[in-house]
């Protein structure tokens, strides 16, 4: 790592001789493989942008000239070149480097949201601010790719950027044909055609040389052919796509030819006005295991053997796999079921459905808003759509869920993977808002399975709903041990345990613990501990948590304290809804909530995040005993 060890700032990079850059690129790739193998992270995207990121920091004056990485999972090389290489052993760990850009880490990081398609809007606003300040020689660079240009927000931003003819916005399209998997849609097809241009031009040049070597006849033939050259070319290569937006376009540029990248970026730097630089890169470049992973090119990995790319720990049965398998079964029984993903068929478990029912599967690109309203259209025409997305990305499509689906009482099922605390991907990837968001949607039903069996049951029940939207939410990771109900009430609420105080006492308070989804495991353990502290405990799982089942209100009226345990934010979730329902029924039973605090959570492992916010079993027990002591004077 000889050259890499000498780089701690972009100024060091600019001082390098051109002949050193190829060696540096190789060192960076080796560094990435070694470090990401030890911590997990986004490997494939970063292997693909090594030369591009070197070029960006050689050509532009960061941080004075902001370089904004859309989504920013491909910002590892940027972090290395701005002095954070020594901290890569802490990537995605508590107190360590974020897996995305982070304003707290470096002045070179201007933004930190990891949701796609936002960089161009940031750039538009920043360039307007620079213009207002009279700072006309300051570029703003937005690097967008990995499928993000399939998001509508990018095109809204481009429309505004193009209108600012005297604003220096450099849009770098990192075109690797991928998001998690091959990018889908008309825009992706246009980029694929643009990638044909170097080949086309080589053929035309060869033809030109051949014809001109034939003398007068060849010259006349070339002139005749040249007359319709552009017409033919436009039918093959849609080079007008970006210029028709009113923006200068250069490319495609080989993203792994350092000199070509540097020259293109230097041209863009000196161009006065908005400009697009189209750079073609290869995701996973230089690492054989990634290049062999044709489905995802090692977009994201866990801890692995750097020599082979094989995970260190064997994967266990997970929530996503169980959902995937059950949806295929349902799809086999019902031809009206269709599935929609927003560029994440593999991560959300829809790849198997797509393989079994390709005509009933739709990948809409990184376009959650469109996904929900397209699903509404499918429902209007008699289908039952299942939209599978990460919980955090429902935030982007809330208006569509509310106004395009729920207002019309349409039977659309939204499956939310990665609900609750996800951990290492940080603040913007936690799925802690979905319960609060969906709680205000009229007519919606929200299910939270506690284990594999209830996931399968609730998914089947959800697709049977035909008079409004339904949501099934589950967390990231391995499935917990199955939990059998000892009784099921008429409205579907499962009684998981009746636990009597030990020793038995007529004075023992009666506690009702309401567990939301996978928090049932913790709720049962809490119940056992509170029994030992002198309480009678009933543990229930509502299964369908929104709206609040009436049997919960009745149960609450018969208890001395109600404790809800959920993995969403404390305001607006199941605990809040239950409290409202008790107030409406004039039930005065005290109620308390164990939930995620109303704040953005720093990245760390899921277990560490829960521990840091008193959501682990020991902390919850301590909290509950405090409540008991204050209410009943009997907690130990």
Curated annotation (Swiss-Prot):
Catalytic reaction annotation: D-glyceraldehyde 3-phosphate + pyruvate + H(+) = 1-deoxy-D-xylulose 5-phosphate + CO2
SMART domains the UniProt entry points to: Transket_pyr
Molecular function terms from GO: 1-deoxy-D-xylulose-5-phosphate synthase activity; magnesium ion binding; thiamine pyrophosphate binding
Enzyme Commission no: 2.2.1.7
Keyword Transferase assigned: yes
InterPro entries: Dxylulose-5-P_synthase, THDP-binding, Transketo_C/PFOR_II, Transketolase-like_Pyr-bd, Transketolase_BS, Transketolase_C, Transketolase_CS
CDD domains per the UniProt record, alphabetical: TPP_DXS, TPP_PYR_DXS_TK_like
Gene Ontology CC: one annotated term: cytosol
Principal EC category: transferase
Required co-factors: Mg(2+); thiamine diphosphate
Subunit structure: Homodimer.
Protein's name in the database: 1-deoxy-D-xylulose-5-phosphate synthase
Species of provenance: Corynebacterium efficiens (strain DSM 44549 / YS-314 / AJ 12310 / JCM 11189 / NBRC 100395)
Gene: dxs
